[in-house]
């Protein structure tokens, strides 16, 4: 199943709507039963919470949206039940927030989970659009622009990170 975000980004609204309807049809029984729907890809997860309800305008899409959360939100919400590692490392972590995470103020839960549960010393990399999300960074016509955008702030910050630092970014896009 697909949330339809990739089609929507390309202006293919009818195809996006069809994919969103298929996904909502599959997820609605779970949402109705109180099951939390956890997404690992910020663009898709947040499409379920924002674009899909607007695109479909149905109670089912709204129910799925209300049940959907990011992995970091799930972990942060269930924090009291999670054991804190006895030997939590104070390893430095450079966190790159996905544009959709930034737009919905959802970098904070990822930062909190890394800091409070994993014991990491987290620094959020301050960036504008990295130019690499979705299909943009892969496109023949947009690849060079994508690289220039990444070089504006993200890639220099990654290169400047200490050797022992972990670089963390949610999702696959």
How would you label these PLM feature ranges?
Residues 1-173:
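Iron-sulfur cluster-binding electron-transfer modules in prokaryotic oxidoreductases
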